[in-house]
Amino acid sequence: MPTINQLVRKGRRSQSSKSKAPALNYGYNSMKKSQVNNPAPQKRGVATRVGTMTPKKPNSALRKYARVRLSNLIEVTAYIPGIGHNLQEHSVVLIRGGRVKDLPGVRYHVIRGALDTAGVTDRKQSRSKYGTKKPKK
C-alpha cells in the first residue's frame, strides 16, 4: 500500500483495459507498410483455411472455423455460426468481434449473409443473426 507522500508525488494511475478483439483496432498503410490505428466494427478478409476443431473439456462437437487474413494483414481464427456453410479457401468474408467460449483462441465470428458467405438455409427463427432472407408464403 502506498504512503500518503507517494500518492501526493505520483497519484493513482487508472488501469487501461485490453481490447477483446485486437485485430479490429488496426488498419494497414500500404504506402508506408505499417499498421495505423483505425478501429472498425467489422473487417473484410480472405479465408486461408477452413476446417473443424473440437471444443474444450465438458463439450463435444466439431465446430467449424476459418483462418482469415484480414485487410490489415493480420491473420485470425473466426468461428462460422449456423448449420452448414459454403466457405472454402480464398472466400472473401466479413468478420466481427465475439469470442467462442469453448474454442481457445477463437475471438471472432464470420458474418453470415455478407460477401461470399451464404446465409443459413431453411432458418425460420433468429434469421437476422444468420443472414437468412424472409421465406415466401
Swiss-Prot record:
Pfam families: Ribosom_S12_S23
Region spans: Disordered: 1-24
GO terms of biological process kind: translation
One GO CC annotation: small ribosomal subunit
Positions carrying 3-methylthioaspartic acid: D102
NCBIfam families in the cross-refs: rpsL_bact
Subunit description: Part of the 30S ribosomal subunit. Contacts proteins S8 and S17. May interact with IF1 in the 30S initiation complex.
Name of the protein in question: Small ribosomal subunit protein uS12
Gene of this entry: rpsL
